[in-house]
Design a protein with these regions (language model features):
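A C-terminal functional module that forms or caps the active site or interfaces directly
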Residues: 248-258
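Active-site/ligand-binding surface loops and adjacent short beta/alpha elements
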Residues: 160-162, 170-248
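Beta-strand-rich N-terminal accessory domains
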Residues: 1-83, 229-249
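Glycine-rich, pocket-lining loop/helix-strand segments that form or immediately flank
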Residues: 34-50, 78-103, 116, 180-204
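Extended, loop-rich substrate-binding clefts of extracytoplasmic carbohydrate-active enzymes
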Residues: 86-144
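A short, structured loop/turn motif at beta-sheet edges
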Residues: 70-74, 106-114, 141-146, 175-179, ...
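Residues that act as N-cap/strand-start positions at coil-to-secondary-structure junctions
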Residues: 11, 22, 63, 98-101, ...
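Acidic, contiguous internal or C-terminal segments within carbohydrate-active enzymes
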Residues: 6-8, 19, 28, 120-174
Length: 258
């Protein structure tokens, strides 16, 4: 597989993406220090959909409440194991249908930028799971010590395209023990979840917070994320920020047990 390496012109920051493995970001290194969690690696992502690095979860992030969904007056029945659908331990469709999808087409590549697209209307397997013809474009750029990911969805049919996707960056600070990491979150609304990880309808406001991670674990859902909101993790003299610049009103904070 062709790995595209991007270099920041103004710093030792280097990023790598693999378009033919789902346009996944596999590495973000600062002067050789890896800042993305590698987990089981690219091979497990390609063969089993086990996430690592920065995968795109599309056309839905997280899990659906059933194997049937309705959007834009269209009802779709999904079958885990078919047409890109993967199931969580409870049998619910999770993280969309593009895990390791090989059909991305690179439309632009420079030393510090990469753009690739998927035409949903051209692939019957994708349309079987998400029957809304459109072109999905992801553009990444590395500059000024910032990796920017911009996503564009352009409808190519008569139906509007439902939006429920996201990215799943796995961040790490190799210079500090996990227990010493400090996480910062903006003001949010915390959503109640049941034992399957599905929203219950309950919620409560959560003010901006800063706390040591220690031995805590999270898999929590939030909405009312303001445009420009900043999430951060710091430790060992290093700080990584994630900026929700535009178009992402919801978030999931995930920190598996140590």
């Amino acid at each position: 597989m062709h790995v595209v390496t991007l270099r920041d012109p103004s710093s030792p920051l280097v990023a790598q993406f693999v378009p033919e493995a789902g346009m996944i970001g596999t590495s973000l290194r600062d002067d050789g220090v890896e800042l993305l969690g590698q987990r089981r690696g690219l091979d497990a992502y390609v063969s089993e959909g086990k996430t690592m690095g920065i995968p795109i979860l599309y056309p839905w992030a997280n899990r659906l409440g059933d194997n049937t969904y309705t959007a834009q007056d269209v009802t779709v029945t999904l079958t885990p194991g078919e047409n890109g659908v993967r199931a969580d331990p409870n049998g619910l469709p999770i993280h969309g249908v593009l895990a390791a999808y090989p059909g991305w087409r690179v439309t632009d590549e420079t030393d510090s930028g990469l753009t690739a697209e998927v035409d949903f209307g051209a692939d019957p397997r994708l349309l079987a799971s998400f029957p809304f013809p459109h072109v999905l474009t992801v553009a990444v750029r590395l500059a000024d010590r910032t990796l920017t990911v911009r996503t564009t969805v352009t409808a190519t049919g008569d139906r509007a395209v439902p939006m429920c996707f996201g990215f799943h960056p796995y961040l790490q600070l190799p210079d500090a023990p996990r227990a010493d990491w400090v996480i910062e979150t903006p003001p949010l609304r915390h959503l109640g979840l049941d034992d399957k990880g599905l929203p219950t309808g309950g919620s409560e406001p959560q003010p901006a917070r800063e706390e040591a991670l220690r031995d805590k674990a999270f898999d929590d859902a939030y909405d009312q994320v303001a445009e420009g909101a900043v999430f951060a993790v710091s430790g060992g003299g290093r700080r990584i920020e994630v900026h929700f610049e535009q178009g992402y009103p919801a978030a999931q904070i995930f920190a598996p047990p140590p």
